Structures are given as C-alpha cells and as structure tokens.
Amino acid sequence: MNVTSLFSFTSPAVKRLLGWKQGDEEEKWAEKAVDALVKKLKKKKGAMEELEKALSCPGQPSNCVTIPRSLDGRLQVSHRKGLPHVIYCRVWRWPDLQSHHELKPLECCEFPFGSKQKEVCINPYHYKRVESPVLPPVLVPRHSEYNPQHSLLAQFRNLGQNEPHMPLNATFPDSFQQPHSHPFAQYPNSSYPNSPGSSSSTYPHSPTSSDPGSPFQMPADTPPPAYLPPEDPMAQDGSQPMDTNMTNMTAPTLPAEINRGDVQAVAYEEPKHWCSIVYYELNNRVGERFHASSTSVLVDGFTDPSNNKNRFCLGLLSNVNRNSTIENTRRHIGKGVHLYYVGGEVYAECLSDSSIFVQSRNCNYHHGFHPTTVCKIPSGCSLKIFNNQEFAQLLAQSVNHGFETEYELTKMCTIRMSFVKGWGAEYHRQDVTSTPCWIEIHLHGPLQWLDKVLTQMGSPHNPISSVS
C-alpha cells in the first residue's frame, strides 16, 4: 500500500454515488466533484436520498436537488471552475458535455440554473440535452417564373451604396434587446426578409439597451419554428465528435402536395468539419487553415506542442512582417475564444481578459442591427453568433426572389472576429483588416447547402462579375 492510498479516504456516500458515474475518464476529478456535493447535501434533510432516487430510477419522477448559487454562478472543483448543473450532468449522464448551451431544464424543474434563484437544481434528470433541429429542405422551382427585368441585382447595388462607410458598433449585453419581444420591421433596401429583432425601420446608431443579465444565466433561446414557403406549409426542438449527433439530421418526409415535379427539394447535410478558421494579421493571412472536427473549439494565443485537434493555437504561428502592435496584441489574446456548435447554433464565449469583436450578419439579423454591425463581447460573456434555423428560413424565402438574392446569403456564412482591438464607427480602425489579430470563420454546412440551392437555381439573369 502506498502513502497516497493510505491517507486517501472515500466516504461510503461518495462511493455509492460514483456507482452511477458515466464514462471512465477523469476519475479523480469526478470523485472530488461528488465529494464536494455530498458535503453540501448532507446539510439538507432528505437531499441525499432524493439524489440517489433520481440516479437509481432515471425514468421515474423526482424532486429538485439543490445547492446554494455562488456569486458568479460557478462551482470550483480541483482548480477548475464550472457551472454546477453542467458538472453533475457530465458526471452522471453525458461525459462529453461541454457547455450550458447544450442543456435545457425540464418543465418539472422548480430551480433551473437559468431562473436566477438563490438555489440551483443539480438533479441531472431535471435537464435534457439540446437536440439538433431537423431543417426542412429548401424547395427550388425547376422553372423560373420571374421576369429578368425584375432582377434584384439593382437592389444589391443600392444596398452596398447605402451601407455606412464604417460598421456600426454594439456591446453585449448592454446593446441587445430581447429579440422576439418587438414587432417585425425591415431595414430600408435590405435584401434580407424581416428580421425578428428590429423595432425600427432605420439603421440604429446605437442599438436599444436592455437588461444585461448575467453571462452565466443565459440559456439558449428557444429556436423559432422551421420555415417553408407559405403555399407549402409543413409542420415541424472534451468535445463531441461531429459524427455522433449532428449527422443524424435527415430531411423530413415531404407531404404529398409538394412531391411534385415543378420543385426540387434540397436538403441540409452536416459536413465532416462544421467550420474552418483562417488567422490574419492586418491584411496578411498567417498559417494554414484550421478545420474544426469537434463541436467545441478553442482559439487561443498559446502554443500547444501536443497538436490538440480541438485547439487552434495562434501562438505557434510566425510572420516575418509582424510589427510591435501585432506582437503586443498577440500577448493579450490569452485564452482567446471558445466556439461551440450545438443544436444547430454557434456560440462564441470570450475567455480572454480582453474583449473580442464579432461581425456576424446572422447575429445582426436576429437582433435587428445593421448587417455590418460589429458586436463587442466582453471577457466572460458568450453570444450566439449563428442560428441554422434562421438561416434556413432566409434560404427558403430568398429562393423565390431570384439567384442574386440567394447569392447574397453567402456573406452570412462567414463570421469575422478580432482579438483585443475593435473596429467600426466607434474605433479609429475602420475595417477588420486594420486590426492587428483577427480570424475568419467559414461555416461549411450553410455554405454547402447554399451552394447546392444555387446550383439547382441555375445561372443568374444578370451574372455577378467584378464590374457588376
């Protein structure tokens, strides 16, 4: 018997609860997490019994098992901080769980994490994992019924001319209103259909403020219902490898009335890599393209000799043209940004001590901002930057407005993000290519889906060219 085992003692209660642990990794961490929980639950009469009942009879109704909420909502276990309901759902249900964005409480839960109460329920069977929504196929007419004279290319020219010289700016969460609590409206000359978050018909110089809330208390928004054209209604909720949940999204069976010869159904397919990331310094691309094979990706300023496939380490990349401003900015990237792809939604969580700045047309559409608005995400906050279902709605609506309208959506499939230094109307840098360190994220699923739809639509009436 060695010295470590001589002095280590696991209580019978902890051993009992560890009997229901899922997965075989991180035994010591799980043991410490359960031990910390037992110490809290022993102070509450009946709490231990209720937890054991929930774990032993997962199909049966059970009561909330609560612990006090900490100031920042997180719990520290062995030098690692995490949200309590995520920690214990990982221990007893889903070892590959990465983020609170992947969880939603059941209706029976009285103390869900997002309710901001003094107590937090950690009963793992009071939460469910967010499922990837099934996206309806886009129905492309086989024969265009639109007059070439009515092409929307001229509107795109106008939109480009009307866009401000510099992008507008917004700060999360102060500038963000609740997206579904305002009437629909539309920006003038915008090529996108009505955005759900706009409450003004003019470009906002500074978006409307709202209750900022807490970054630790922001559950994922309930996805909007899937969209099909009005004449064809259809009724429609470590890291995880891409081929487990995401690739199960098969197209639903089409109703008889739209199984007809005059439309071609183009279904969404999940690609092998959900995104690729390219790193830039000013207007120079640096290093190779990073392909995300995991639904959880870290982009940080460190070096990682182990070549972890879930990390894009910018500290490894060299550039002979690097100046002192870039060098100083790189030193402040630190833990960088955590990108999650869960339930058909992409989230960016700022882990750096400095803010990150995001330009996502899908996010801007959702919140009713001008398409080119740059959103500041402070340290410790996370923001949804892309929603597959909203993109599906736009894709299905735009197909009836011609090739050029559909092609415009390619801009929505690329997200730009700068570290430490921002750009736009409130900063002296006007364009992202003027920022020292930035990345461009290409979303492969939406891009490939859009490409297939455009292929079915055929050539535009007025081909887009360098002089169009």
UniProtKB/Swiss-Prot annotation:
Positions of modified residues (N-acetylmethionine): 1
Keywords in alphabetical order: Acetylation, Cytoplasm, DNA-binding, Metal-binding, Nucleus, Phosphoprotein, Transcription, Transcription regulation, Ubl conjugation, Zinc
Any Pfam family matching the protein: MH1
PROSITE patterns linked: MH1, MH2
Post-translational modification: Phosphorylation of the C-terminal SVS motif by BMP type 1 receptor kinase activates SMAD1 by promoting dissociation from the receptor and trimerization with SMAD4. Phosphorylation by ERK2 MAP kinase in response to EGF or HGF prevents SMAD1 nuclear accumulation and transcriptional activity in response to BMP. Dephosphorylation, probably by PPM1A, induces its export from the nucleus to the cytoplasm. Dephosphorylation is inhibited by association with EGR1. Ubiquitinated by SMAD-specific E3 ubiquitin ligase SMURF1, leading to its degradation. Monoubiquitinated, leading to prevent DNA-binding. Deubiquitination by USP15 alleviates inhibition and promotes activation of TGF-beta target genes. Dephosphorylation, probably by PPM1A, induces its export from the nucleus to the cytoplasm. Phospho-SMAD1 is ubiquitinated by CHIP leading to disruption of the SMAD1-SMAD4 complex.
Domain MH1: 12-136
Binding positions for Zn(2+) per the UniProt entry: 64, 109, 121, 126
Expression (tissue specificity): Ubiquitous; present in liver, lung, stomach and spleen with lower level in heart, testes and skeletal muscle.
The keyword Ubl conjugation is annotated on this UniProt entry: yes
Region (Disordered), start-end ranges: 162-246
Low complexity composition bias: residue spans: 188-210
Region (L3 loop): 421-431
SMART domains referenced in this protein's UniProt entry, alphabetically: DWA, DWB
CDD domains: MH1_SMAD_1_5_9, MH2_SMAD_1_5_9
InterPro entries with a match to the protein in the record: Dwarfin (IPR013790), MAD_homology1_Dwarfin-type (IPR003619), MAD_homology_MH1 (IPR013019), SMAD-like_dom_sf (IPR017855), SMAD_dom_Dwarfin-type (IPR001132), SMAD_FHA_dom_sf (IPR008984), SMAD_MH1_sf (IPR036578)
GO cellular component, one term: cytoplasm
Assembly, per entry: Found in a complex with SMAD4 and YY1. Interacts with HGS, NANOG and ZCCHC12. Upon C-terminus phosphorylation: forms trimers with another SMAD1 and the co-SMAD SMAD4. Interacts with PEBP2-alpha subunit, CREB-binding protein (CBP), p300, SMURF1, SMURF2, USP15 and HOXC8. Associates with ZNF423 or ZNF521 in response to BMP2 leading to activate transcription of BMP target genes. Interacts with SKOR1. Interacts (via MH2 domain) with LEMD3. Binding to LEMD3 results in at least a partial reduction of receptor-mediated phosphorylation.
Protein name: Mothers against decapentaplegic homolog 1
Organism: Rattus norvegicus
